[in-house]
């Protein structure tokens, strides 16, 4: 590992001397509000009229009655059929304004959508292969993307009138596709991981690769970051979770409780906990900072003869308001759990628009009001779910 003096100074010590000023949130709100002006200037994309807006009914399986049964069931409100020209594996919501979101697809494009009416506002091109990961900065008007083309790209969404487009930086170093990215909440530092099994740490301004975190032996599938130690958590197809010590550039804790590959991991937005889901349909809940196992739910609640080894969990999302955990499966199944108790509240099947071979749910996110859930699918569609709260 080679570390430049500048990047080493950035990462060797997470202390007050390198933290941003306390008005970071105000600055972030200012920067993101400017995106509204950016959207208002954009003409409607010619592709917008080609999106087939469909509404389907969720095929629901009633969960057993329990004390924490939801006040209202989640229902499919809208389907954006043909939202992309290939599978959609990445989604990110602007958490500051809650007004727009972005999706990335096998068609190598990134699309920006208006959340209020789900209209297409812009299409970003530059990647030459499919998009696997997206991340929106809360501190700058930047969008970061990672793709099968082994590259990371930074997009300045305020440079809409530039002849060169709004891509302002690219980061090269990965030897395979980039499947997950994450931004440090306080520093201008980007984390990326993917097929080459290495977590790479970047100074987003200088594009310097500040350090590499080694240890995983298979694809890295998720990266979560936090203000507090451990500041970086990663999951992998090798079935492990690693909590990293950035000061020492090494694994602080290795979690090996999963028996199958881990496809998704998600930190709770308000609690010092996180969850991980594997290809056997098992979801495990962990307590930070020591990584203690708090709860197990998913197929672990079923008897052995009910287990289905094909129950691959591709995506997890946590509702910031209702504390509901969503899990999306490779065969199109959906499940909603009480995050605190682990009890199953609702399950169902999302019907595929292109046959069972393309029924997978690949990515998901709740909006900041907790009233909407966005899911991305193998059949090229985006779906919006809601409740009657």
UniProtKB/Swiss-Prot annotation:
The subcellular location is: Cytoplasm; Nucleus
Q: Name one GO biological process term.
A: mRNA cis splicing, via spliceosome
Gene3D superfamilies (alphabetical): YVTN repeat-like/Quinoprotein amine dehydrogenase
Which InterPro entries does the UniProt record give?
G-protein_beta_WD-40_rep, Prp46/PLRG1-like, WD40/YVTN_repeat-like_dom_sf, WD40_repeat_CS, WD40_repeat_dom_sf, WD40_rpt
Identify the keywords attached in UniProt to this record, alphabetized: Cytoplasm, mRNA processing, mRNA splicing, Nucleus, Repeat, Spliceosome, WD repeat
Which residues does UniProt assign to the signal peptide? none
Q: Outline the WD repeats, range by range.
A: 83-123, 126-165, 173-212, 215-254, 257-298, 308-347, 356-389
**What's any one GO cellular component for it?**
cytoplasm
* Annotated Pfam families: WD40
User: Taxonomically, which superkingdom?
Assistant: Eukaryota
Describe the function of this protein: Involved in pre-mRNA splicing and required for cell cycle progression at G2/M.
Indicate the quaternary assembly.
Answer: Associated with the spliceosome.
The UniProt family comment states: Belongs to the WD repeat PRL1/PRL2 family.
Name this polypeptide is given: Pre-mRNA-splicing factor PRP46
Question: What gene codes for this chain?
Answer: PRP46
